[in-house]
Amino acid sequence: TAAAKVFVLFGDPVEHSLSPAMQNAALQAAGIDGLYIPWRVKSVGLPAAFESLRGMDNFGGANVTLPHKEQAFSLVDTLTQEAASVGAVNTVVARGGRLLGANTDGQGFLRSLHEEAAFLPRGKSAVILGAGGAARAVSISLAEAGAEEIVIVNRTIERAQSLAEFVNREIGASAIGLGLDDPRMPDRVRNCALVVNTTSVGLSPSDPPPIDPSLLRPGMLVYDLIYRPLETALLREATKRGCQVMGGLGMLLYQGALAFELWTGQKPSEEAMRQALVAAIGQKAPPSSPSPSRGEGTACVDSSPLVGKGPLT
């Protein structure tokens, strides 16, 4: 109808995003007269696109995905604490003609850990593969949740060390950055409770695992932010070794649910959102997964193998 609220997803590309299916299902389940649409926009056009939102009486809210999350950070009027910490915006909320920038990636990640794996980070050690925007959101959320040690492993060691220093400085956590060939890395992986892949290694079915799977041990949780394919080589090898495994659909779902609540003030039907995601992917989660996991490729992965650029919605 003419009064329908419009919700948009900014990105480039956006054609294969699962967010429209998920959010439109949530709007319908909530009885909200609204439509969530993908809006492909180049970086040069993003400022004008954001400005157009201010003049829309029926603007309901927006998501931001690659490659615009960092640019969106500078285009909003105010920021949530999470967005300010991560340095990126994935959710935009209209507040009295002003635009509030939020980042739901980290909280979405934590919720997926709690809800789908009954995993509490407090007092546990974690290894993060990658050092880009996705790794930043994950590392910050784990540090704030009380993880005992966060080991950031990246091909470019300077990026890993820089992120570790930021987490230690801002949150007072115990984080270290290591290169892929650091002799300390194997033992850190063997002895951790959680391994998180935030890189794009695994998006292609021919990709090998991003680390040597012989380092994985029974009982640890191996979480790959990639959700398409639902089972990456890393998760497949982890399952063989008796690990608990998770893909990225959970994170995509929960970060989207948090965004919906910010826009509407209502909690969405997460079941309707989950069903829409699974239908959009067109395949079922592997039996080893605690629940359906991931979508466009990843919930929030870094686009360069073990280097990374930024998160994806």
Where are these regions (language model features)?
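Rossmann-like adenosine-cofactor binding region
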Residues: 173-245
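Glycine-biased, low-complexity coil/linker segments
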Residues: 295-296, 307-310
